[in-house]
Curated annotation (Swiss-Prot):
CDD domains xref list: Dtyr_deacylase (cd00563)
Family: Belongs to the DTD family.
Name of protein: D-aminoacyl-tRNA deacylase
Keyword tags: Cytoplasm, Hydrolase, RNA-binding, tRNA-binding
NCBIfam families cross-referenced by the UniProt entry: D-aminoacyl-tRNA deacylase
Species this protein is from: Dehalococcoides mccartyi (strain ATCC BAA-2100 / JCM 16839 / KCTC 5957 / BAV1)
Main localization (coarse): cytoplasm
DNA repair as UniProt keyword: no
Subcellular location: Cytoplasm
Chain's gene name: dtd
GO biological process: D-amino acid catabolic process
Amino acid sequence: MKAVVQRVSRASVRVSGETVGEIGPGLAVLLGVAEGDTEEDAEYLASKIINLRIFSDAEGKFNLSLKDLCREMLVVSQFTLIADTRKGRRPSFIEAAQPQEADGLYNVFIRLCREEGTQVATGQFGAMMMLEIYNDGPVTIILDSRDRLNPRL
């Protein structure tokens, strides 16, 4: 499972011209589910993102998390994060989870975030969406749940 996490001053998502999710200051999370991902991957990323210290304290240091500040989160499914571009010029999405499996884990991720007290707005799984993201900083971090299996050097 991969996530692109962006600190935002505000963000919104529209489907067919209608706003279906919007937040003020917080995090916009683009979430991609890969074949073989499990609830453990969702648990890892939910905890990591909610507690990631990428908000500045009074001294300007990254010491505060979304949870510390009770900020909001916008979560949008994005299977294109699982693209394999190693061969040729057209991305392959063969490693992306099947839609039913991906939708289930996407919803597990959202539920876990909400259970931690985070206000979560969402896009619509599988829909064509228009995102408006006001990146604050900019601060953008890429996370992969499989990284937890690799020891840090």
